[in-house]
Every structure is written in structure tokens, then in C-alpha cells.
């Protein structure tokens, strides 16, 4: 996959998405342009990723709590990939690509208020795409726009308030303790690399400076 010319213009990073049963159920893939302003074909990118993460891959399925008034976020049945497109141009390209329902596209909360982004989010959701809201918007989203998001993403330093309409996922878990804390806080999945314990503090004595 990395030899594909399309990916030669991108920097890739990945982490595991883990559920409450401690099973790896999906992958979180971060894509960043190798150079600012690089033009990436979102449709071609999604097609390429679809070949790497096919329908037969492991799947995450969540049942969302309905919104007041009868609305509700779409389910994530069959989700295999959480896609974090770093950079405004790349995100726009991905949002405007044909929907791949098993891929969940992350959208930063501070961008959702932009009319072009909101329109792309609505169109992708209407086409069957899955979306995650990353962070907390400054103001409450309109119900129709909020319902486009199946999941809301947080990190330990800025945990989201409980009781929101979307299922919560925590990013950046780096240890089993981080993982347990995420689930204790009410998150349904966590993304990161929490395998193995963090290094133990050094017990070596500090060198004593010679007397003058």
C-alpha cells in the first residue's frame, strides 16, 4: 500500500481502537499531507483504503442513544476504520468523496460551524457515511447536524460531559491504566496503543557531587 503514488504525498500514523471487551475492533488512521497545500484526490484515497480495509475486516458496531424529539445518530455497524484527516484541504477532500459506510470520518468540532463543512457533513451522512465529532463545539449544534455524528471523540485532558447524544470515544490512551480510566468515564471505545505497562521509575541513586 505504501508504494502507491497517492500515499507518497501523505504521512501515515495508526492506532488500535479497543472496545470494552478489550478487543481490537477497528483501526484509527491519521493522514497528513507531506507538504502543506498538497492536493489529494479524496475519492481515489477512499477507494485505495477500501482495498486495504475490505468489508470482511473486523467490525465495530455501536447502538446509539436517540436524540430528544425522535432523532438519532446513525449506527456504526461494520465500522473498520476511523479516519483522521489532518489539514483543512485534505479533510474537505475526504468529506466530499463518495461515502464508505464502514469508514468513520473525524471532523474537528471547531470546523463544524463553517457552512461548507456543515453542508459536506450533512451530505456525507445522507449518503450513508459515518462521522465522528472531535472535541466539543463552542455552541450546541442544530439537531439535524448533531444527528449526523455517530460518535464524539475526547482526550483525557478535555473529557466530554456525560449524557450527550453520541457515544464517546477517548483518544491517546497509552497504558492499561489509561484504557481503564476511559471506560470508567463512560467511553465505549478507546484509541491508542495501551499495550504493556509504562516504564517503571528509575530506582538508581543520583550521583553525589564531590565536596569542595
Where are these regions (language model features)?
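Generic, low-specificity signal for short hydrophobic/alpha-helical stretches with a mild N-terminal bias
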Residues: 3-4, 11, 122, 164, ...
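Residue-level signature of transmembrane alpha-helix interfaces in integral membrane proteins
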Residues: 32-35, 144, 202
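Charge-rich, low-complexity amphipathic helices
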Residues: 67, 146, 204-205
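Context-gated lysine
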Residues: 74, 134, 162, 205-206
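The catalytic core of metal-dependent phosphodiesterases that act on cyclic dinucleotides
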Residues: 89, 94-196
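C-terminal helical cap(s) of enzyme catalytic domains, especially alpha/beta-barrels
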Residues: 199-212
Amino acid at each position: 500500500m505504501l508504494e502507491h503514488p497517492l500515499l507518497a504525498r501523505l504521512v501515515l500514523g495508526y492506532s488500535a481502537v479497543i472496545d470494552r471487551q478489550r478487543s481490537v475492533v477497528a483501526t484509527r488512521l491519521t493522514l497528513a499531507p507531506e507538504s502543506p497545500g498538497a492536493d489529494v484526490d479524496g475519492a481515489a484515497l477512499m477507494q485505495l483504503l477500501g482495498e486495504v480495509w475490505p468489508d470482511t475486516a473486523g467490525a465495530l458496531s455501536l447502538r446509539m442513544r436517540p436524540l430528544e424529539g425522535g432523532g438519532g445518530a446513525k449506527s456504526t455497524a461494520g465500522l473498520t476504520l476511523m479516519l483522521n484527516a489532518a489539514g483543512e484541504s485534505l479533510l474537505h477532500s475526504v468529506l466530499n468523496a463518495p461515502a464508505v459506510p464502514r469508514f468513520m470520518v473525524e471532523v474537528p468540532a471547531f470546523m463544524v460551524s463553517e457552512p461548507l463543512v456543515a453542508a459536506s457533513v450533512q451530505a456525507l451522512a445522507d449518503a450513508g457515511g459515518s462521522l465522528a465529532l472531535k472535541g466539543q463545539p463552542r455552541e450546541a449544534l442544530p439537531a439535524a447536524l448533531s444527528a449526523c455524528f455517530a460518535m464524539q471523540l475526547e482526550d483525557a485532558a478535555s473529557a466530554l460531559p456525560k449524557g450527550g447524544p453520541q457515544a464517546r470515544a477517548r483518544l491517546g490512551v497509552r497504558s492499561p491504566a489509561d484504557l481503564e480510566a476511559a471506560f470508567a468515564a463512560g467511553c465505549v471505545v478507546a484509541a491508542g496503543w495501551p499495550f504493556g505497562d509504562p516504564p517503571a521509575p528509575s530506582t538508581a541513586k543520583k550521583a553525589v557531587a564531590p565536596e569542595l
